[in-house]
Amino acid sequence: MIQVLLVIICLAVFPYQGSSIILESGNINDYEIVYPKKVAVLPTGAMNSVHPCCDPVTCEPREGEHCISGPCCRNCKFLNAGTICKKAMLDGLNDYCTGISSDCPRNRYKGKEDD
């Protein structure tokens, strides 16, 4: 059996750098499928993320921050409910932030065929 050390890079949306977790010494069977034995998280600061909202180890928002990126995320916080996140096109209906998510939900008055 071949012993391998796999490194999976957790990518933050901006700037496409994040942290790593290491899957230690997994075995590869005849079909080259990896069965890891143990997951070891790198210590805090092992990799430095240049994104101010992203914890470099967990790729999650830092303590006290709400989000990392998205149309309803600015300076690591959710935009206020009612903030326009997508301007109206042909249908004349804007999409608005909810204040509790970094996503830009579809305006509930838009039909399924509208976008």
Curated annotation (Swiss-Prot):
Taxonomic source organism: Echis carinatus sochureki (Saw-scaled viper)
Family the entry assigns: Belongs to the disintegrin family. Dimeric disintegrin subfamily.
Pfam families: Disintegrin (PF00200)
Organism lineage: Eukaryota, Metazoa, Chordata, Craniata, Vertebrata
UniProt propeptide residues: 21-47
Keywords: Cell adhesion impairing toxin, Disulfide bond, Secreted, Signal, Toxin
Name the record gives this protein: Disintegrin EC6 subunit alpha
Localisation per UniProt entry: Secreted
Domain of life: Eukaryota
Principal cellular location given in the protein's record: secreted
Disulfide bonds: 53-76, 67-73, 72-97, 85-104
PROSITE patterns: DISINTEGRIN_1 (PS00427), DISINTEGRIN_2 (PS50214)
Short sequence motif Cell attachment site: positions: 89-91
A molecular-function term among this protein's GO annotations: toxin activity
